[in-house]
Amino acid sequence: MSNPRGNPKYFNPNHLGTQPRAAGGNKGKKMQDQSGQHAQVIQTKGE
């Protein structure tokens, strides 16, 4: 059982919702925001 690095379809299921969208990887919503607007920051402590 070798790791077919050149062909990721073997260990990467192509079901709807399993593939990373927009930015790719696990970078969260802040990296996938393509709208060009700044994120709304809610300050909870300090100042």
Swiss-Prot record:
Region (Disordered): 1-47
An annotated GO BP: sporulation resulting in formation of a cellular spore
Polar residues bias (residue ranges): 33-47
InterPro entries attached to this UniProt entry: SASP_SspN (IPR012612)
Induction: Expressed only in the forespore compartment of sporulating cells.
Cellular component aspect of the GO annotation: endospore-forming forespore
Alphabetic keyword roster: Sporulation
Location within or outside the cell: Spore core
Principal location: other
UniProt family annotation: Belongs to the SspN family.
Protein name (record): Small, acid-soluble spore protein N
